[in-house]
């Protein structure tokens, strides 16, 4: 158990070092970008899906790791970008490094696990909702989604209706 905790913490540190590296390189990746945004500190978007749903390892994060990541971001001095401000300032140079937090799909585990933490800590985010599974087993209800929308820290975005795996969809179906 102790080894798991050490590995988990180490993975969080490595993830956030990568995040810091991305900040240092994001404006310099192309000549065109560096021409226009060389003084831009930039915005990095971090996306999450499931919380404490260990049976889905590719899209899950344990809450203790999520909280560690949020604390590291805060301790590094990065601000979380309010999505409404992000939209208004999209094409403007940024004078500070910021994080745009996004949550995909509207899984119930987000509502039960991460939402209380984000609400308590007033961390803004966008929840991209797939509309077809709303209210089904494992997904949030419309009332829960409306609660987040009313919170003034959670913004609702449209993900897709059915969340098809596009590689498997024919051109005609697309």
Positions of the model-derived regions?
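Solvent-exposed, polar/charged alpha-helical surfaces in well-ordered, non-transmembrane soluble domains
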Residues: 64-71, 75, 112, 116, ...
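Substrate-binding cleft of extracellular glycoside hydrolase catalytic domains
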Residues: 85, 102-109
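Metal-dependent polysaccharide deacetylase catalytic core of the NodB/CE4 family, i.e.
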Residues: 41, 46-56, 96-99, 108-113, ...
């Amino acid at each position: 158990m102790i080894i798991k905790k050490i590995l988990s913490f180490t993975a969080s540190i490595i993830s956030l070092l990568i995040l810091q590296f991305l900040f240092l390189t994001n404006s310099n990746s192309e000549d065109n970008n560096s021409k226009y945004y060389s003084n831009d500190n930039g915005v990095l978007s971090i996306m999450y899906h499931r919380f404490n749903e260990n049976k889905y390892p590719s899209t899950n994060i344990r809450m203790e790791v999520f909280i560690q990541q949020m604390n590291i971001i805060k301790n590094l001095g990065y601000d979380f970008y309010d999505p409404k401000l992000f939209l208004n300032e999209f094409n403007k140079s940024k004078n500070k490094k910021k994080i745009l937090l996004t949550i995909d799909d509207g899984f119930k585990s987000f509502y039960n696990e991460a939402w209380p933490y984000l609400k308590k800590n007033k961390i803004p985010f966008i929840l991209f909702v797939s509309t077809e599974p709303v209210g089904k087993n494992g997904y949030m209800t419309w009332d829960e989604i409306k609660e987040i929308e009313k919170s003034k820290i959670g913004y609702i975005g449209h993900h897709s209706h059915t969340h098809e795996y596009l590689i498997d969809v024919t051109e005609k179906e697309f």
